[in-house]
């Protein structure tokens, strides 16, 4: 038997690219929508009442005043800089030399790379980002740590060594 969870609330979904056609044709907002999740994956997005009738055994969570939308995509990120978020520098070179380069060298330790990768991905998921494209460090295991952390969380990533 599959594990089913039904999220009820206003839904936002896309059937096309709103930059290539009228947004009314590409974007659908359903104020009485639902998202059926089966075994941790989105199975169906549609009318909440219809989904509830079709899946009476599903665990239901209501988001009355919330908008349920697709996961966000971050197309350019440097996960190794997670620990120095909001560090200040007068000029870019000062910031790089004072914070970035020393922090990225710390990821030469595989355990630390794993810790930072996990911390970064937990932050992204907590804020609705489900897909990322990240730079890693010059250390090959920094990419391995990110891929492993993403696999552990079921998150999609693009990164490289």
Positions of the model-derived regions?
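N-terminal metal-binding scaffold of metallo-dependent hydrolase/deaminase domains
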Residues: 1-54
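Gly/Ser/Thr-rich helix-start
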Residues: 47, 72, 129
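Alpha-helical scaffold segments that flank or form the walls of functional sites
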Residues: 86-155
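Flexible loop residues that form catalytic
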Residues: 15-16, 78, 137
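Hydrophobic faces of well-ordered beta-strands that scaffold small-molecule active sites
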Residues: 71-75, 132-134, 157-161
